[in-house]
Swiss-Prot record:
Pfam families: Methyltransf_25. It comes from Alkaliphilus oremlandii (strain OhILAs) (Clostridium oremlandii (strain OhILAs)). Keywords: Methyltransferase, S-adenosyl-L-methionine, Transferase. S-adenosyl-L-methionine binds at residues 56, 77. PANTHER family: TRANS-ACONITATE 2-METHYLTRANSFERASE-RELATED (PTHR43861). Its EC number is 2.1.1.-. Belongs to the methyltransferase superfamily. YrrT family. It is an enzyme of class 2 (transferase). One of its GO terms (biological process) is methylation. Could be a S-adenosyl-L-methionine-dependent methyltransferase. It comes from the Bacteria. This is Uncharacterized methyltransferase Clos_1076. The keyword Transferase applies.
Length: 216
């Protein structure tokens, strides 16, 4: 798994400015950002009485939504600076050092959520991660992933061409360098693990996959 800690330690202080801004290269990626976070919460409303694990807490924006709506949350975040900011926002939430392939928590969960983070794993690591997360999830529990994904090769090609035409070169480099998958590649992993799933499109980049353990 690639080590992005230095990058995110540097980005931590300006991350919220990026996601909430309406005038930067990433504006369309984070379009309907709050709606996306709320949609994740909505997807696990039936699991509110259980325990929720959030991976890739970042600065705690999704965590804050979950806490305000009464969820019991444990957060995982590898970046020291991101953890610091999230803990300042949410001092009562347990946020520990870890990542998708290393969860130092001896508990099981009724829901596992992640937003704008799963793309840091390559496809093989995603397979390993979902298999690993399955071991922490109670029967009928849910895994919810919100991230940039592509519905087809043609859609990806057209989107990258548009980004290049718009001269959004930082975004273009990000889209090429990180591991943004085709939706079917991720849903196939869930199918092999015996999960049912739903898919929702939030903007031209971001989709939400909500997968239920034992749903098949």
């Amino acid at each position: 798994m690639a080590d992005f800690n230095q990058l995110f330690d540097q980005w931590a202080n300006t991350y919220d400015n990026t996601v909430f801004s309406t005038d930067n290269e990433y504006t369309q990626v984070f379009e309907r950002y709050e709606t996306t976070l709320q949609s994740i919460c909505d997807a696990i409303q039936d699991k509110k009485q259980g325990l929720t694990l959030e991976i890739g807490v970042g600065t705690g924006n999704l965590t804050k939504h979950l806490e305000q709506q009464g969820f019991q949350v444990i957060g995982i975040e590898p970046s020291k600076q991101m953890r610091r900011i999230a803990k300042d926002k949410l001092p009562h939430i347990e946020i520990v050092d870890g990542h998708f392939l290393s969860i130092p928590v001896a508990k099981t969960f009724d829901s596992i959520v992640t937003s704008y983070a799963f793309h840091h794993l390559n496809l093989e690591e995603k397979h390993q991660a979902l298999t690993y997360l399955d071991s922490f999830l109670n029967q009928s529990g849910k895994i919810v992933i919100a991230d940039t994904m592509f519905e087809s090769e043609e859609y990806k090609r057209e989107l990258l061409n548009k980004v290049e035409k718009d001269r959004a070169y930082n975004l273009l480099e990000d889209l090429k360098a990180e591991y943004y998958e085709y939706i079917n590649d991720i849903t196939d992993i869930f199918l092999n693990l015996g999960y049912s799933f739903t898919i929702s499109k939030m903007n031209k980049y971001v989709w939400i996959i909500c997968a239920t353990k034992g749903g098949l």
